[in-house]
Amino acid sequence: GKPDGAFXDNITVVESVXFXI
């Protein structure tokens, strides 16, 4: 989960956990 969008253009719960953001 990154502001620029690792998978999307927003930060999801999955991204937050995975990336830690």
From Swiss-Prot:
Annotated GO CC locations: extracellular region
Tissue: Hemolymph.
Primary localization: secreted
Coiled coil: none
Statement: the UniProt record of this protein carries the keyword Secreted: yes
GO MF terms, alphabetically ordered: carbohydrate binding
Entry annotated with the keyword Secreted: yes
Domain of life: Eukaryota
Induction: By infection.
UniProt keyword annotations, A-Z: Lectin, Secreted
Localisation per UniProt entry: Secreted
Described function: Binds and precipitates antigens of the parasite Echinostoma paraensei.
Name recorded for this polypeptide: Hemolymph 65 kDa lectin BG04
Organism from which the protein derives: Biomphalaria glabrata (Bloodfluke planorb)
